[in-house]
Amino acid sequence: MNYDLSQKFKVYLEFSGKKYRIYGQSIGISHLDLGGGSSGSLLLNDKKQIAGIYFGVDGANNELGLAQLLRWKPETYHNDEARSVAYDLIFGNKNTTKYYAQFVKEHKTHLYEQIKQINNDEFRFVEKTKRHNLG
């Protein structure tokens, strides 16, 4: 089950006295509550690739585990997805004001050097907009 986090959580969430904007898609996994301290656990797909990051639960009895997807590219033939906007948790999208790749570029981290060397378009589809050019 996909959750549009901006609609589900009304855009902002407060944690430790700070407001955070929730954006993107998550996956809801029935009967999965990993318990306290498990936020940040990896969600793997059937090919053992990272698909998302576990962050919490939803439902009256915490019966639905939630994982933030790393990447979302909606299919236009699904009504629910047609209203969604493509995004990438690392590279952002046209609506993102701050994103992780921006941080790694500004601080010249090791990850930025690795990103520049990627030749696989599968991992760079958001970067192709003018705003997200990492080169």
UniProtKB/Swiss-Prot annotation:
InterPro entries on file? Flavi_NS3_S7, Uncharacterised_MG067
Q: Which family does it belong to?
A: Belongs to the MG067/MG068/MG395 family.
Which Pfam families does the UniProt record give?
A: Peptidase_S7
Q: What is this protein called?
A: Uncharacterized protein MPN_584
What molecular functions are annotated in GO for this chain? ATP binding; RNA binding; RNA helicase activity
Q: Which cysteines are joined by disulfide bonds?
A: none
Top-level lineage group: Bacteria
